[in-house]
UniProtKB/Swiss-Prot annotation:
Residues that, per the record, bind ATP: 48-55
Catalytic activity: Zn(2+)(out) + ATP(in) + H2O(in) = Zn(2+)(in) + ADP(in) + phosphate(in) + H(+)(in)
PANTHER family per UniProt: METAL TRANSPORT SYSTEM ATP-BINDING PROTEIN TM_0124-RELATED, ZINC IMPORT ATP-BINDING PROTEIN ZNUC
Keyword Zinc appears in the UniProt entry: yes
UniProt keyword ATP-binding, yes or no: yes
Name of the protein this chain belongs to: Zinc import ATP-binding protein ZnuC
EC number: 7.2.2.20
Domain ABC transporter: 16-231
Predominant cellular place of this UniProt entry's protein: membrane
Function in brief: Part of the ABC transporter complex ZnuABC involved in zinc import. Responsible for energy coupling to the transport system.
Source organism of the structure: Haemophilus influenzae (strain 86-028NP)
Gene Ontology CC entries for this record: plasma membrane
InterPro entries reported in the protein's UniProt record: AAA+_ATPase, ABC_transporter-like_ATP-bd, Metal_Ion_Import_ABC, P-loop_NTPase
Keywords carried by this UniProt record: ATP-binding, Cell inner membrane, Cell membrane, Ion transport, Membrane, Nucleotide-binding, Translocase, Transport, Zinc, Zinc transport
């Protein structure tokens, strides 16, 4: 399946092109025939089962994993800001937020101040990284990612372990950041159905691209509005899968079926 993100009419050239990407580990296929164009200002969410290749796709895009075959083409002006799923900090070596952000090469103190203010966490400047809450840590990692003023923001499962209220707040923050930077967003979601409402394209990946589409806007659902309120409904969307095939527990395609819509998580 070939997927092309929403094309920006004023910037027709993609920031990144993935062409026929295949990744194989010890005869086990991680990615198969992935084709994807990422255009300026687009917002793409990638979902799929555990072990389905989502993280491998990000690593390939970030040049952390060489594809077995295929190629990744980068535009000359692409600047990527990356928000990892988590970082490991040595608790025996305390480090403040300010010091952590200053470790990024070529960053000035004023740039750190501006980024902290933009993410509304200036009050955390002197805080110990090891003592931050999960939500605070995500904001710090997002702050670090925008220091180089990226035109593509890549986030690996930013809402993992966060309840739906926290997800809505984080999605709103990502939306605001995207608007200020005028950048594209590529995000991996751990949830198969709940995604950022602003996603222009949702891709379900299980080795290959199983299906793609747009999320349903939950603010149009009066029942959801009554249960969760306007803020959550405005920022959270629901993605309905429409697969035409099934996968075995090992991820292999086991036949086509026009009614196949199931996507199950499996152990990594």
């Amino acid at each position: 399946m070939n997927i092309t993100a929403i094309r920006n009419e004023q910037n027709p050239q993609p920031l990144i092109q993935l062409k026929n990407i295949n990744v194989v580990f010890a005869q086990k296929t991680a990615l198969q025939d992935i084709n994807l164009n990422i255009y300026p200002n687009s917002i793409i969410t990638i979902v799929g089962p555990n072990g389905g290749g989502k993280s491998t796709l990000l690593k390939t895009l970030l040049k952390l994993q060489m594809p077995t075959s295929g190629e990744v083409i980068y535009s000359k002006n692409v600047r990527i800001g990356y928000v990892p799923q988590k970082i490991h900090l040595d608790h025996s070596l305390p480090i403040t937020v300010e010091r952590f952000l200053s470790l990024k090469k070529g960053i000035k103190t004023q740039e750190i101040s501006t980024a902290l203010e933009q993410l509304s966490i200036s009050h955390l400047r002197k805080s110990n990284m090891q003592k931050l809450s999960g939500g605070e840590m995500q904001r710090v990692l997002l702050t670090r990612a925008i220091l180089n003023k990226p035109n593509l923001l890549v986030l690996d499962e930013p809402t993992q372990g966060v309840d739906i209220t926290g997800q809505a707040e984080l999605y709103q923050l990502i939306h605001q950041t995207q608007q200020k930077l005028n950048c594209a967003v590529l995000m991996v979601s751990h949830d198969l159905h709940i995604v950022m409402a602003d996603s222009k394209e949702v891709l379900c990946i299980n080795q290959h691209i199983c299906c793609a589409g747009t999320p349903d806007v939950l603010s149009n659902d009066p029942t959801f509005m009554r249960l969760w309120g306007n803020q959550i409904a405005q920022n959270v969307g629901f993605y309905t899968h429409h697969h035409n095939h099934h996968h075995t527990l090992h991820g292999d395609v086991c036949g086509c079926n026009s009614s196949a819509v199931h996507c199950q998580n499996k152990d990594k």
